[in-house]
Design a protein with these regions (language model features):
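Juxtamembrane luminal stem/stalk of type II transmembrane Golgi/ER carbohydrate-processing enzymes
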Residues: 137-151
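Catalytic core and acceptor-binding pocket of nucleotide-sugar-dependent glycosyltransferases
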Residues: 27-125
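Conserved donor-nucleotide/metal-binding helix-loop-beta segment in metal-dependent transferases, i.e.
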Residues: 1-29
Length: 151
């Protein structure tokens, strides 16, 4: 176990056939329906420097290949990470969703690391270039205040 991955909270109680793996065979992140034992989150991972850098280099190689082929994985880096995990069972320690607990969710786990809802702090669509309309810093703060403190 040279790597550290965390189970994606949206799939902790689902069977592998229902995981949202990339099912496009043209993509280097492709995972067939009969493969994969865990669905991992792309937001928290680590490991020994050698293992982590080797993983990063492999994921970079696959990403570049997909770009050359005009393919974008379903969940981008998370899809690539899941393919890597499926190909390397036993090479990583899988942490439970308690270490990647989304803000506002109710799951039967103790919250150890809370993942904040980024849309409360900035305009996600504008950052991803899906919208020309951006909210100011003050608008984001006001909306977060209203959501957290007003009835």
């Amino acid at each position: 176990e040279q790597l550290l991955l965390v189970q994606q909270p949206g799939f902790w109680n689902k069977k592998p056939m229902f995981y949202s793996y990339d099912r496009n065979p043209r993509c280097t992140a492709y995972i067939p329906y009969n493969c994969g034992r865990a669905y991992v989150s792309g937001g928290l991972n680590g490991g020994t420097s050698a293992a982590f850098l080797a993983m990063c280099k492999e994921l970079d190689r696959r990403t570049e290949q997909d770009i050359r082929n005009g393919v974008v994985p379903l969940w981008h880096d998370e899809s690539q990470l899941n393919r890597y995990a499926a190909e390397h069972p036993g090479s990583y320690r899988l942490l439970p969703p308690t270490y990647w607990y989304p803000e506002g969710w109710q799951m039967p786990f103790e919250q150890k690391i809370i993942v904040r809802n980024k849309s409360r702090y900035f305009d996600v669509a504008a950052v991803k270039h899906h919208s020309q309309h951006t909210r100011s810093w003050l608008q984001c703060k006001w909306e977060a205040f209203c959501e957290n403190y007003l009835p």
